[in-house]
Amino acid sequence: MTTLTLNTSLLSSCRILAAFSGGLDSTVLLHQLVLWRERHPDVTLRAIHIHHGLSPHADSWVRHCETVCERWQVPLVVERVTLADNGLGIEAHAREARYRAFAQTLLPGEVLATAQHLDDQCETFLLALKRGSGPAGLSAMGERSPFAGTLLLRPLLRETRKTLEQWAVRHGLCWIEDESNQDDAYDRNFLRLRALPLLQQRWPHFPAAVARSATLCAEQERLLDELLASDLTDCITAEGTLRLSPLMSMSDVRRAAILRRWLAMRNAPMPSRDALERIWQEVALARDDASPCLRFGDREIRRYQSQLWWIKSVAGQHETTVAWPVWQTPLALPAGLGTVQLVPGGELRRPREEESVSIRFKAPGVLHIVGRNGGRKLKKIWQEQGIPPWRRDTTPLLFYGETLIAAAGVFVTREGAAEDKEGVSLVWHA
């Protein structure tokens, strides 16, 4: 193996963040990138090590990575993550936390490089096959993928684990061995330790053949993207919701493909066939007077005004009152609803000295809003303004004392209208 086996065509960026666990694969990747940097002095290289806290050896692994990076003059970032039981399983949760840390560490203009190789690609394909995935899932990993507003690169994806080990031995590299890699209770370890050696003994080029199949699946998926682009444009609104009327006349297969692509655009996890069927039957085709909702982890799919919405699950806040004693500073809202602030210049009057300021999520009685004749209850205003039901008890309502002044981004009451040019605006950062 020479430095040329690193897929340098991917390395157009001069700023690289390498994921570095200290294991064999990432050690070879970092070594290759250090050699690449020697040949290209304009390259800026950093490494990141994730301390999961799962192994009693985790602290010693950090010290090992620090030693390696100091020797190779690579700045190292160590991120400690906390893993809580979220129902995903420890493998999936650790991966989620790891990539979240990567995203938070990346600097502007920097790309992430990870050390997946051909055997990893084979394992990923087989795991997707076990789950009954279609072409999208069987595409496995690409050498270049969008990630956190930049790119995730896998420059070693064409190399086998055996080739990486030969390189490491030839160059006297030291690496750590994670004891959990020998536990075949984990699906990926089972494939690596038991299934793949047997398959490769029978068919030595099995991983390469699987990688070709993954590439063909990826090509088919890209072709579908091209063929369905026009349909997708017709179905998706400016808000990112999915219009149902065009889907009604589509075949089941075409409609499912559109649903998958819409969910992918919303960064949703890839749905199973059963999940797609439930979305269509239980949400899209629910009776007209229903407010259907299907939960997916901390997200929901809802229907409103003949459109499907992919939204974050938020508990209703209609009984919540948040005091705002210093209204000149931003106020944090509960339930992850963001912040609100009153900024100079706007159509709201400032609170009088004797008026307390608060944020609430319900308002009783008949309300009179600017630009409308007569009074109406809040429920009627929500309906007239086209506010979806799930936003009606999570939209901040500004009160001065017991008087409703405004609903963030929706309306201003007559009692809240500015009386002079010294008004303010209610800004909601959701």
Curated annotation (Swiss-Prot):
One of its GO terms (cellular component) is cytoplasm. Signal peptide: none annotated. Keywords: ATP-binding, Cytoplasm, Ligase, Nucleotide-binding, tRNA processing. GO terms for biological process: tRNA modification. InterPro entries: Lysidine-tRNA-synth_C (IPR012796), Rossmann-like_a/b/a_fold (IPR014729), TilS/TtcA_N (IPR011063), tRNA_Ile_lys_synt (IPR012094), tRNA_Ile_lys_synt_N (IPR012795), tRNA_Ile_lys_synt_subst-bd (IPR015262). Its EC number is 6.3.4.19. It catalyses: cytidine(34) in tRNA(Ile2) + L-lysine + ATP = lysidine(34) in tRNA(Ile2) + AMP + diphosphate + H(+). It is an enzyme of class 6 (ligase). It is found in: Cytoplasm. ATP binds at residues 21-26. SUPFAM superfamilies: Adenine nucleotide alpha hydrolases-like, MesJ substrate recognition domain-like, PheT/TilS domain. Belongs to the tRNA(Ile)-lysidine synthase family. NCBIfam families: lysidine_TilS_C, lysidine_TilS_N, PRK10660.1. Ligates lysine onto the cytidine present at position 34 of the AUA codon-specific tRNA(Ile) that contains the anticodon CAU, in an ATP-dependent manner. Cytidine is converted to lysidine, thus changing the amino acid specificity of the tRNA from methionine to isoleucine. This is tRNA(Ile)-lysidine synthase. It comes from Salmonella newport (strain SL254).
